[in-house]
Regions:
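GIY-YIG nuclease catalytic motif and its immediate N-terminal context
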Residues: 1-37, 41-53, 58-65, 82-84, ...
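Short arginine-rich
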Residues: 42, 65-78
């Protein structure tokens, strides 16, 4: 099974949210539709700007924790390294099973 660590943004250089999931397509859909009450709904954080994939749940959880502890500037640098225009990557995730291991794409 694949696991994904992802970063959502409200806009370029806006509010950021780091999460982990086993189903990125479903989870991004939930964020965009405000299915669950919480941070992303409150701050309108709906734009998928970065993701990476692993097959190990413990690696995904550790990476999520690591990114959550990073300084904001480091997260922005990570996003801009692979997605300099801060494009919404949610339209590119329909082929995740055969796709790249990062959302830098």
């Amino acid at each position: 099974m694949n696991y994904y660590v992802y970063i959502l943004a409200s806009k370029r250089n806006g509010t950021l949210y780091v999460g982990v999931t086993g189903d990125l397509i479903k989870r991004v859909y939930e964020h965009k539709r405000d299915v669950r009450a919480g941070f992303t709904k409150r701050y309108k954080v709906h734009k998928l700007v970065y993701f990476e994939m692993t097959t190990e749940i413990y690696s995904a959880l550790a990476r999520e924790k690591q990114l959550k502890n990073w300084k904001r500037d480091w997260k922005i640098g990570l996003i801009e390294k692979g997605n300099p225009r801060w494009d919404d990557l949610s339209e590119k995730i329909n082929s995740l099973d055969s796709g790249p291991s990062t959302g830098s794409g």
